[in-house]
Protein backbone atom coordinates (compact mmCIF):
# COMPACT_ATOMS: atom_id res chain seq x y z
CA UNK A 1 0.00 0.00 0.00
CA UNK A 2 1.60 3.28 -1.07
CA UNK A 3 1.10 6.77 -2.49
CA UNK A 4 3.11 8.87 -4.92
CA UNK A 5 2.81 12.55 -5.86
CA UNK A 6 4.62 15.05 -8.09
CA UNK A 7 5.06 18.82 -8.07
CA UNK A 8 3.01 19.96 -11.05
CA UNK A 9 4.10 23.60 -10.82
CA UNK A 10 7.61 24.35 -9.51
CA UNK A 11 6.89 28.04 -8.91
CA UNK A 12 3.74 27.54 -6.86
CA UNK A 13 4.64 24.07 -5.55
CA UNK A 14 1.31 22.53 -6.53
CA UNK A 15 1.35 18.85 -5.58
CA UNK A 16 -0.59 16.38 -7.70
CA UNK A 17 -1.37 12.90 -6.39
CA UNK A 18 -0.46 10.38 -9.09
CA UNK A 19 -1.26 7.31 -6.98
CA UNK A 20 -3.48 7.39 -3.89
CA UNK A 21 -3.73 4.61 -1.29
CA UNK A 22 -2.60 2.19 -3.96
CA UNK A 23 -2.68 -1.46 -2.90
CA UNK A 24 -1.54 -4.15 -5.34
CA UNK A 25 -0.11 -7.61 -4.74
CA UNK A 26 1.39 -9.53 -7.66
CA UNK A 27 1.94 -13.24 -7.20
CA UNK A 28 5.20 -14.83 -8.31
CA UNK A 29 4.88 -16.47 -11.73
CA UNK A 30 1.70 -14.63 -12.67
CA UNK A 31 0.93 -12.62 -15.81
CA UNK A 32 -0.76 -9.32 -14.94
CA UNK A 33 -1.95 -6.72 -17.46
CA UNK A 34 -2.45 -3.13 -16.30
CA UNK A 35 -4.88 -0.96 -18.26
CA UNK A 36 -5.87 2.69 -18.00
CA UNK A 37 -6.15 5.82 -20.09
CA UNK A 38 -3.24 8.28 -20.33
CA UNK A 39 -2.43 9.78 -16.95
CA UNK A 40 -4.09 7.02 -14.95
CA UNK A 41 -0.83 6.10 -13.19
CA UNK A 42 0.20 2.97 -15.11
CA UNK A 43 3.77 3.99 -15.92
CA UNK A 44 4.29 5.45 -12.46
CA UNK A 45 3.31 2.08 -11.01
CA UNK A 46 5.86 0.35 -13.24
CA UNK A 47 8.64 2.70 -12.14
CA UNK A 48 7.78 2.20 -8.48
CA UNK A 49 8.05 -1.58 -8.81
CA UNK A 50 11.51 -1.24 -10.33
CA UNK A 51 12.70 1.50 -7.99
CA UNK A 52 13.03 4.20 -10.65
CA UNK A 53 10.56 6.15 -8.50
CA UNK A 54 10.33 5.80 -4.72
CA UNK A 55 6.97 5.82 -2.91
CA UNK A 56 6.43 8.88 -0.71
CA UNK A 57 4.29 7.00 1.79
CA UNK A 58 3.62 3.35 2.44
CA UNK A 59 5.81 0.50 1.19
CA UNK A 60 6.75 -1.18 -2.07
CA UNK A 61 8.08 -4.69 -1.39
CA UNK A 62 9.70 -6.93 -4.00
CA UNK A 63 10.56 -10.50 -3.00
CA UNK A 64 10.63 -9.51 0.66
CA UNK A 65 12.79 -6.42 0.12
CA UNK A 66 11.54 -2.88 0.59
CA UNK A 67 12.16 -0.52 -2.33
CA UNK A 68 13.46 2.39 -0.28
CA UNK A 69 17.03 3.49 -0.96
CA UNK A 70 20.37 2.78 -2.61
CA UNK A 71 20.97 -0.18 -0.31
CA UNK A 72 18.16 -2.20 -1.86
CA UNK A 73 17.72 -0.62 -5.31
CA UNK A 74 20.57 -2.58 -6.90
CA UNK A 75 19.15 -5.93 -5.77
CA UNK A 76 15.62 -4.90 -6.75
CA UNK A 77 16.69 -3.98 -10.27
CA UNK A 78 18.45 -7.31 -10.67
CA UNK A 79 15.18 -9.01 -9.81
CA UNK A 80 12.86 -6.71 -11.76
CA UNK A 81 13.80 -5.94 -15.36
CA UNK A 82 12.08 -3.23 -17.40
CA UNK A 83 11.30 -2.93 -21.09
CA UNK A 84 10.06 0.42 -22.37
CA UNK A 85 7.96 1.62 -25.29
CA UNK A 86 10.61 2.67 -27.81
CA UNK A 87 13.08 -0.14 -28.64
CA UNK A 88 15.56 2.33 -30.16
CA UNK A 89 16.00 4.01 -26.77
CA UNK A 90 17.15 0.72 -25.24
CA UNK A 91 19.85 -0.22 -27.74
CA UNK A 92 23.36 0.61 -26.49
CA UNK A 93 25.62 -1.36 -28.85
CA UNK A 94 26.20 -1.74 -32.58
CA UNK A 95 26.07 -5.56 -32.40
CA UNK A 96 23.06 -7.53 -31.13
CA UNK A 97 24.95 -9.95 -28.87
CA UNK A 98 27.01 -7.13 -27.36
CA UNK A 99 23.82 -5.25 -26.58
CA UNK A 100 22.36 -8.28 -24.81
CA UNK A 101 25.61 -8.72 -22.86
CA UNK A 102 25.72 -5.10 -21.65
CA UNK A 103 23.57 -5.51 -18.54
CA UNK A 104 25.15 -8.82 -17.52
CA UNK A 105 28.66 -7.36 -17.79
CA UNK A 106 27.66 -4.62 -15.35
CA UNK A 107 26.71 -7.32 -12.83
CA UNK A 108 30.31 -8.52 -12.77
CA UNK A 109 29.51 -11.94 -14.22
CA UNK A 110 32.42 -14.07 -15.48
CA UNK A 111 33.01 -13.93 -19.29
CA UNK A 112 32.25 -17.63 -19.80
CA UNK A 113 28.94 -17.28 -17.96
CA UNK A 114 28.12 -14.10 -19.93
CA UNK A 115 28.59 -16.00 -23.20
CA UNK A 116 26.26 -18.73 -22.00
CA UNK A 117 23.59 -16.31 -20.77
CA UNK A 118 23.65 -14.22 -23.96
CA UNK A 119 23.29 -17.27 -26.20
CA UNK A 120 20.48 -18.72 -24.09
CA UNK A 121 18.63 -15.39 -23.96
CA UNK A 122 18.82 -14.88 -27.72
CA UNK A 123 17.62 -18.44 -28.33
CA UNK A 124 14.73 -17.92 -25.92
CA UNK A 125 13.44 -14.88 -27.84
CA UNK A 126 14.19 -16.42 -31.25
CA UNK A 127 16.96 -13.97 -32.16
CA UNK A 128 20.07 -16.17 -31.96
CA UNK A 129 20.63 -16.17 -35.72
CA UNK A 130 20.77 -12.36 -35.60
CA UNK A 131 23.40 -12.22 -32.85
CA UNK A 132 26.09 -10.67 -35.08
CA UNK A 133 23.75 -8.27 -36.86
CA UNK A 134 23.52 -4.52 -36.30
CA UNK A 135 20.39 -3.60 -34.29
CA UNK A 136 19.56 -0.77 -36.69
CA UNK A 137 19.01 -3.39 -39.41
CA UNK A 138 16.27 -5.10 -37.41
CA UNK A 139 12.52 -4.52 -37.45
CA UNK A 140 10.81 -2.89 -34.48
CA UNK A 141 9.56 -6.23 -33.20
CA UNK A 142 13.02 -7.77 -33.49
CA UNK A 143 14.60 -4.82 -31.64
CA UNK A 144 12.10 -5.19 -28.82
CA UNK A 145 12.87 -8.91 -28.59
CA UNK A 146 16.57 -8.03 -28.32
CA UNK A 147 15.67 -5.64 -25.47
CA UNK A 148 13.79 -8.48 -23.75
CA UNK A 149 16.80 -10.78 -24.28
CA UNK A 150 19.02 -8.23 -22.53
CA UNK A 151 16.73 -8.40 -19.51
CA UNK A 152 16.48 -12.22 -19.58
CA UNK A 153 20.28 -12.53 -19.58
CA UNK A 154 20.30 -10.79 -16.19
CA UNK A 155 18.04 -13.59 -14.86
CA UNK A 156 15.26 -11.50 -13.30
CA UNK A 157 12.32 -12.98 -11.43
CA UNK A 158 9.98 -10.37 -12.91
CA UNK A 159 9.81 -8.31 -16.10
CA UNK A 160 7.77 -5.10 -16.25
CA UNK A 161 6.91 -4.03 -19.79
CA UNK A 162 5.63 -0.48 -20.24
CA UNK A 163 3.63 -0.48 -23.49
CA UNK A 164 6.33 -2.50 -25.30
CA UNK A 165 4.26 -2.91 -28.49
CA UNK A 166 2.91 0.65 -28.79
CA UNK A 167 5.31 1.57 -31.61
CA UNK A 168 5.18 -1.75 -33.44
CA UNK A 169 3.16 -3.00 -36.41
CA UNK A 170 0.78 -5.98 -35.93
CA UNK A 171 3.50 -8.46 -36.88
CA UNK A 172 5.95 -6.97 -34.38
CA UNK A 173 3.30 -6.89 -31.67
CA UNK A 174 2.58 -10.58 -32.23
CA UNK A 175 6.29 -11.46 -32.00
CA UNK A 176 6.78 -9.61 -28.73
CA UNK A 177 3.60 -10.89 -27.08
CA UNK A 178 4.46 -14.47 -28.05
CA UNK A 179 7.86 -14.03 -26.40
CA UNK A 180 6.29 -12.58 -23.25
CA UNK A 181 3.86 -15.47 -22.92
CA UNK A 182 6.64 -18.01 -23.45
CA UNK A 183 8.76 -16.45 -20.69
CA UNK A 184 5.81 -16.60 -18.32
CA UNK A 185 4.49 -20.08 -19.11
CA UNK A 186 7.76 -21.93 -19.76
CA UNK A 187 10.27 -20.07 -17.59
CA UNK A 188 7.98 -18.98 -14.77
CA UNK A 189 8.97 -15.32 -15.00
CA UNK A 190 6.43 -12.93 -13.50
CA UNK A 191 5.11 -10.57 -16.16
CA UNK A 192 3.59 -7.13 -15.58
CA UNK A 193 2.36 -5.81 -18.92
CA UNK A 194 1.18 -2.22 -19.25
CA UNK A 195 -0.79 -1.89 -22.46
CA UNK A 196 -3.49 -0.02 -24.37
CA UNK A 197 -4.34 -3.09 -26.45
CA UNK A 198 -7.26 -5.15 -25.20
CA UNK A 199 -6.26 -8.19 -27.28
CA UNK A 200 -3.01 -8.26 -25.31
CA UNK A 201 -4.71 -7.81 -21.95
CA UNK A 202 -7.06 -10.76 -22.47
CA UNK A 203 -4.07 -13.10 -22.66
CA UNK A 204 -3.03 -12.27 -19.10
CA UNK A 205 -4.11 -14.20 -16.00
CA UNK A 206 -5.32 -11.01 -14.38
CA UNK A 207 -6.33 -7.53 -15.52
CA UNK A 208 -5.96 -4.42 -13.36
CA UNK A 209 -7.79 -1.29 -14.54
CA UNK A 210 -6.57 2.07 -13.22
CA UNK A 211 -8.14 5.51 -13.25
CA UNK A 212 -7.00 8.66 -11.47
CA UNK A 213 -4.23 6.84 -9.64
CA UNK A 214 -6.60 4.26 -8.18
CA UNK A 215 -7.47 0.65 -8.99
CA UNK A 216 -11.03 0.48 -10.31
CA UNK A 217 -11.16 -3.15 -11.45
CA UNK A 218 -8.96 -6.12 -10.60
CA UNK A 219 -10.00 -9.57 -11.78
CA UNK A 220 -9.63 -12.16 -14.53
CA UNK A 221 -10.03 -10.91 -18.13
CA UNK A 222 -13.38 -12.73 -18.28
CA UNK A 223 -14.76 -10.91 -15.26
CA UNK A 224 -13.28 -7.50 -16.05
CA UNK A 225 -14.58 -7.34 -19.62
CA UNK A 226 -17.97 -8.68 -18.57
CA UNK A 227 -18.40 -5.23 -16.97
CA UNK A 228 -18.84 -3.69 -20.43
CA UNK A 229 -20.40 -0.37 -19.40
CA UNK A 230 -18.01 0.19 -16.49
CA UNK A 231 -14.93 -0.41 -18.64
CA UNK A 232 -16.30 1.99 -21.26
CA UNK A 233 -17.04 4.62 -18.60
CA UNK A 234 -13.36 4.55 -17.65
CA UNK A 235 -12.42 5.63 -21.17
CA UNK A 236 -11.27 2.21 -22.33
CA UNK A 237 -12.24 -0.08 -25.16
CA UNK A 238 -13.16 -3.74 -24.80
CA UNK A 239 -11.90 -6.58 -27.04
CA UNK A 240 -13.41 -6.38 -30.54
CA UNK A 241 -15.19 -9.71 -30.13
CA UNK A 242 -16.73 -8.55 -26.85
CA UNK A 243 -17.87 -5.34 -28.55
CA UNK A 244 -19.45 -7.25 -31.45
CA UNK A 245 -21.47 -9.58 -29.23
CA UNK A 246 -22.66 -6.60 -27.18
CA UNK A 247 -23.74 -4.63 -30.26
CA UNK A 248 -25.64 -7.64 -31.57
CA UNK A 249 -27.52 -7.73 -28.29
CA UNK A 250 -26.53 -11.33 -27.63
CA UNK A 251 -25.93 -12.88 -24.23
CA UNK A 252 -23.27 -15.52 -23.65
CA UNK A 253 -22.62 -17.63 -20.57
CA UNK A 254 -18.96 -16.58 -20.61
CA UNK A 255 -17.59 -13.26 -21.85
CA UNK A 256 -16.40 -13.60 -25.45
CA UNK A 257 -12.83 -12.31 -25.62
CA UNK A 258 -11.31 -13.47 -28.91
CA UNK A 259 -12.18 -14.18 -32.53
CA UNK A 260 -12.19 -17.98 -32.23
CA UNK A 261 -14.64 -17.96 -29.33
CA UNK A 262 -16.73 -15.35 -31.13
CA UNK A 263 -17.03 -17.48 -34.28
CA UNK A 264 -17.94 -20.56 -32.25
CA UNK A 265 -20.56 -18.68 -30.23
CA UNK A 266 -22.16 -17.10 -33.31
CA UNK A 267 -22.20 -20.47 -35.06
CA UNK A 268 -24.03 -22.11 -32.15
CA UNK A 269 -26.43 -19.17 -31.88
CA UNK A 270 -27.35 -19.35 -35.57
CA UNK A 271 -27.74 -23.13 -35.46
CA UNK A 272 -30.09 -22.82 -32.50
CA UNK A 273 -32.32 -20.47 -34.49
CA UNK A 274 -32.59 -22.76 -37.52
Where would I find each of the regions flagged by the language model?
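Conserved ABC transporter NBD signature motif
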Residues: 58-68, 76
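Helix-to-loop junction immediately C-terminal to a conserved catalytic motif
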Residues: 50
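Catalytic Walker B motif of ABC-type/P-loop ATPase nucleotide-binding domains
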Residues: 159-162
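Conserved ABC ATPase signature
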Residues: 134-138, 142
Amino acid sequence: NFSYAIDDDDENQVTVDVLKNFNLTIEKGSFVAILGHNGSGKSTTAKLINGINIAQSGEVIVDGQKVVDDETIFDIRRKVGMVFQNPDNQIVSSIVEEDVAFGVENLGVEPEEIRKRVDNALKTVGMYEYRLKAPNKLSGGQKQRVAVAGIIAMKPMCIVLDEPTAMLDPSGRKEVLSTIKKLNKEDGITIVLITHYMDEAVQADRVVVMDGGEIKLDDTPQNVFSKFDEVKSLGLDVPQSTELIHRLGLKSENTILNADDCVEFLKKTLEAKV
